[in-house]
Amino acid sequence: WQRIVELGDAGTMHELVSGEVFKFIRGLGGSSMQEHMRGATFGISSPATLKLVMDKLDKIDLKSKDLAGDLYEYMLSKLTTSGANGQFRTPSHIIDLMVALMEPTFKDRIIDPACGTAGFLVGAAEWAKGAGQGSGKAFMTKANHERYETEMFHGFDFDATMVRIAAMHMFMHGIDEPNIAYRDSLLPLPDP
């Protein structure tokens, strides 16, 4: 990141990020992110816009996964695609209420059949990891931590872009292998 920012020249930065870095991210082998990023395109076409965004992000301490996740959530709230295809983002206070009523634990499997940006799954993950589990003590066991990262949360959406956004949202909140799949949850399940 720092080396790209230090390049200074907007054209060089854009060429490197759109050509090499994005290509690398799309090809991360052995991870679910590779599947989610298949067919993704780099959406910042202007070198000047990329430089502006990178300069602004560089001023923020993104080493904290919580801060990075919060920033990502803020950017999600500004999505212009909200309402397209009948999709609407659930307000965070509604997510918080639903999660508090549910009180998820590490014994649960949480499935969101229309996950959109994965706001509900992230809320449930944060609850299980922290506030709802005695301030994170249960999260510290190896078994709980592994279950949290690999099999506790599942989301489905019928919009490929939302699947990518949801997977990245989960990743930004510490779920290294997000179980987010492209699927219309109203259709019958395929035969096994």
Residue map of PLM features:
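Non-catalytic, mostly N-terminal accessory regions of nucleic-acid modification and defense proteins
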Residues: 1-106, 179-188
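Conserved S-adenosyl-L-methionine
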Residues: 84-192
